[in-house]
Amino acid sequence: MEESKKFQIKDLIITALMVLCSQLIYRVLSFMFVSPYTMLLVVPVWAIAGAIAYFLVPAKTKNPWMILLFCVLTSLIGFYPPYIISCIVGGVFAMLIAKIKGALNYKGLTVGYMIFCVLAGFGGMYVPFLFYAEQTINSYKEMFGDKYLGMLNKIVSPMTTVIMLIIIAICAFIGGIVSKKLLKKHFEKSGMI
């Protein structure tokens, strides 16, 4: 395992490109907002599909600070304060784990990614319903209508939130495994990392 290396400008470029890739994946998944049932699956599916972008950052930069930057930039794209705070806190944990375990330690990176995804899901999807319920419900009513809102009210609860956060953690773990295999099979063999 290589030690972390010093900051380089190309690290910023790589990190920014991976944030862009991650956000493009999320935007493609936004079609899942068509139903309240599928809306709940956006973050878990993103935790699997977007993992490769997250794992490419330390693989290419070998710098734990770039993990934090990835999480911060991801949060800023959300334009929602609870999401921003949650992603930054998750990023700090992920960066600290990478500094302690090593920037290329897959177990440490996977745990950090799981923490980041759970906090991002909590801050972005569940905080609005748990703490700003009236505002969120009115906003969804305007965007999607009464029928959508009725279904949403039936399925969103504190228990649903806990279950979904566990599902997000499991999906982030799966995303970590898939990313590790992709990195080894395609990126290492081709000499990209």
Language-model features, listed with the residues they occupy:
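Short, charged juxtamembrane terminal tails flanking transmembrane helices
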Residues: M1-I9, L183-I193
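Interfacial aromatic-anchored transmembrane helix boundaries in multi-pass membrane proteins
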Residues: S30-S35, M39, V72-L96
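Hydrophobic transmembrane alpha-helices
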Residues: E2-L68
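Short helix-perturbing small/polar motifs within transmembrane alpha-helices
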Residues: L17-V19, L24, I88-M125, G176
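Hydrophobic alpha-helical transmembrane segments
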Residues: L12-L17, P44, P64, L68-L69, ...
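Alpha-helical transmembrane segments of multipass membrane proteins
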Residues: M18-Y26, S30, G50-Y54, G78, ...
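Membrane-embedded alpha-helical hairpins and interfacial helices in multi-pass inner-membrane proteins
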Residues: V111-F187
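Membrane-interfacial segments
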Residues: L29, F33, Y37, T61, ...
